[in-house]
Each structure stands twice: as structure tokens, then as C-alpha cells.
């Protein structure tokens, strides 16, 4: 390895199975070792079939998602690992994977399935996207999609803008790590969007955490 060369040159991508334990996700064992959230540091942690993960395992991510680190305490002492990762999750709308109007699951079963993910954890996921059912004509239609290379260039450009915005700050490295004071500095709201956000807070009973994320 040459002088000044980084040990890791690519952002990690981790996709643990839904049977992972809390020690496997956060880290642990007798001699504390990093878990999946630390192995995904500065990269992506992808959780597929999110409601299939044990609820107590998912809940352990709440504090690391906010703080960007996790502390493992054992009898011999404690150790803090970095865990500033991007959480990407996917799930079906119903237990059998069908759309709500076509599912054979009862309303109670669907509600129990969705309630496996707590509100506080959902508050820590900044973007939610509902994917509609794709029709056969859309699947078979001949049309060119945007190439991955073009998307990659947009992502790189966005990252570079964020690096310039925060001017080498150790505490804030990207938009997701901004706190309330950073948002006020870099993303001041005009009166109209501020009023819209106030209405949403009142109508939807949004939490303070969601207010900061949406602002």
C-alpha cells in the first residue's frame, strides 16, 4: 500500500438476513466485535423484508441511527464503534406480498404485520416511497431507462456539493447528518413552505424528529 492511500476505497454495502441477532446487527460477543451497522459505516445497510426482522433487533438501531456510533458494554469494559450508515429498507404491503385490495390476509393480520415496525424507527427513515403495482404492458414496453452511469454521476455531483457546503466538517459530512442548527443555516425556509410544514405538523401529528427531517 502506498503512503497516503486509504485502506478502504469503496463504500460498503451490507445486506444481513432477517434472522440476524441483535449482537450480529449491533456488535457484541465476549470481546466486542463490530456488527453489521458498523461494517456498513459510510456505506449502505440494506434490510430486505423489514417486518420479518425481530422487532427488538430493529429497535436497537434507533440510537446508532441518530448518533452515528454504537457503544458495546461487556464485563471487561466497553467499546465504541462508528456506525454512520445509510439505512435502505424494503417491505411488502401485506404478509402474502400482494396489494391490500388483493391480499388474502385479514385487516387484522395486515395491521399486525405493519405494526412490527415502530413509529420511532419509521421517524428515523427520511424518505418513504410506495411502489405501485406494475402492469404487464409497462413491463414489456420497449423504452430505454436512464443508464446507471448517468445516475452515478449525479450521485457523485451531489456528494461533492455537500462536501463543499460543510467545508470539511468532521461533525457533518452529508445532508443526513445535519442537526437543527445546521438546517437553519443551510436550508432556511420562506414563509409559505414554513406555513405548509406547520399545517402538516398539526394535521398529521408529526414528531419533532420528523419536523427536522422534513424541514
Where in the sequence are the language-model features?
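Short, basic, glycine/proline-bearing loop/turn elements
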Residues: 19-23, 101-102
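Conserved alpha-helical scaffold flanking the Walker A/P-loop in AAA+ ATPase domains
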Residues: 23-44
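Walker B catalytic acidic pair
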Residues: 49
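Basic, amphipathic alpha-helical bundle interface domains used for macromolecular binding and assembly
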Residues: 32, 56-213
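AAA+/P-loop NTPase substrate/partner-engagement loops
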Residues: 1-21
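Short clusters of hydrophobic/aromatic residues that line enzyme substrate/ligand-binding pockets
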Residues: 13, 25-26, 37, 70-72
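Short, flexible hinge/linker loops that cap or flank conserved catalytic cores
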Residues: 17, 31, 37-38, 79-81
Amino acid at each position: 500500500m502506498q503512503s497516503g492511500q486509504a485502506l478502504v476505497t469503496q463504500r460498503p454495502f451490507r445486506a444481513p438476513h432477517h434472522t440476524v441477532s441483535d449482537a450480529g446487527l449491533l456488535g457484541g460477543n465476549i470481546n466486542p466485535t463490530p456488527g453489521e451497522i458498523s461494517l456498513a459505516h459510510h456505506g449502505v445497510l440494506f434490510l430486505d423484508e423489514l417486518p420479518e426482522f425481530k422487532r427488538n433487533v430493529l429497535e436497537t438501531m434507533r440510537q446508532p441511527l441518530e448518533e452515528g456510533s454504537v457503544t458495546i458494554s461487556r464485563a471487561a469494559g466497553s467499546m465504541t464503534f462508528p456506525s454512520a450508515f445509510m439505512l435502505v429498507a424494503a417491505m411488502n404491503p401485506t404478509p402474502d406480498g400482494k396489494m391490500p385490495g388483493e391480499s388474502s390476509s385479514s385487516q387484522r393480520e395486515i395491521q399486525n404485520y405493519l405494526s412490527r415496525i415502530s413509529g420511532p424507527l419509521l421517524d428515523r427513515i427520511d424518505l418513504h416511497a410506495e411502489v405501485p403495482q406494475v402492469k404487464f404492458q409497462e413491463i414489456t414496453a420497449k423504452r430505454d431507462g436512464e443508464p446507471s452511469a448517468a445516475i452515478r454521476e449525479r450521485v457523485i455531483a451531489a456528494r461533492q456539493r455537500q462536501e463543499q457546503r460543510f467545508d470539511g466538517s468532521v461533525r457533518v459530512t452529508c445532508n443526513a447528518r445535519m442537526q437543527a442548527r445546521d438546517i437553519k443555516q443551510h436550508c432556511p425556509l420562506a414563509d409559505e413552505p414554513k406555513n405548509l410544514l406547520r399545517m402538516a405538523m398539526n394535521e398529521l401529528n408529526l414528531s419533532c424528529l420528523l419536523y427536522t427531517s422534513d424541514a
